[in-house]
């Protein structure tokens, strides 16, 4: 039986950003306020001063970037908060896309000096596709930043969404004095501190107390700007926000712990509790009494001391109970889970029960694939985001004949995670890895060596696109595969994939074989 109070208090969201906008720093500070950590690890200039809690994989600690989604949960006031800290690096966009299928809201971090960047636009497009509610945190206001009104204009123009500031900065850089909380009508004066929680000051902006706090000149400027905000921007409307049409905006400095508590306090109040999830068969409501959930991520070796996988399951409805029987829909088998876990980055604890909105980890020995569904018996298939055609391709070869088994296992597990895509060329039988960018090849090589004791080498392969093909005309499909036999491959699901080596070749193939459909995503 679903407990509506438990479901209502859940807040499950992702933090997304362009690389180096301060996303992991913000995650750390939210955990600090949530009481999960005592010291936040500063990620600065790609060097780790103290190890960031949410960057738990060795390669992340070395490089100072996030390369995989971390899942963390904590209680804050009367709410249960689940944070998914996603990779900011552009090469790991697919991991972020999949994560967005498992959240009910998103916080976008924007660098105050740089404004909206490429990756932010792409991620916002995915949020728009799913009507995901968005909150924007403009970070690094303690450094020289763009004019806040210019930033708001840029957000509206670039992200195609209406905005409403709920806090407002008093200057930036060396002149930065703090932020005024429009939502709660109080002043938060800036004290650079990576650990100390700054106190709020209740102040009426129309009295001399404001002048005494920040000086008459800045006080007059702040009053004028707040008046302009009320005249130009719409009042905050929670319904518009929940529909993904209005984004509240906050200003601060995550690294120096400033403006973060205002963001968190407002977020838990206005952010959505678990939302309905669409399955191919029907829409699933979170309050339904029966448990349903889907696997959105698989991580190998979350604990390097044990060669195990964890499948991350987003609970869509009802209540999950440890050791209860659940149907694995794709296999048609009943499974029980004796050690389901929840996370604080790499620290995990066994849970006896979890509710709609929660993310739980299930031990996986190869049973799960991304997109798998678990239910109490009903056959459901949740709709997710597909894999996209990779941008780069390389042959992967074994560099140590004695470690063939380890290499095969490592490739299988990493592909299950969705780090990259694997194709097998039907002409020569060689394995091809397809990725979004170069860094993924480095991560795969590093992890194969450090987690599986297997060595690989890469051989460049010049390809334009991987296209999944299908046709109602079996004869034409067979004729195409015969003509293009050198460029035909199979993906891990056994589907036919055409590896086009140029845009011209693809265009000619589409013209010559009009009854064949060429798809650039794996779901069609």
Short names for language-model regions:
Residues 1-524:
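Structural and coupling elements of P-loop NTPases
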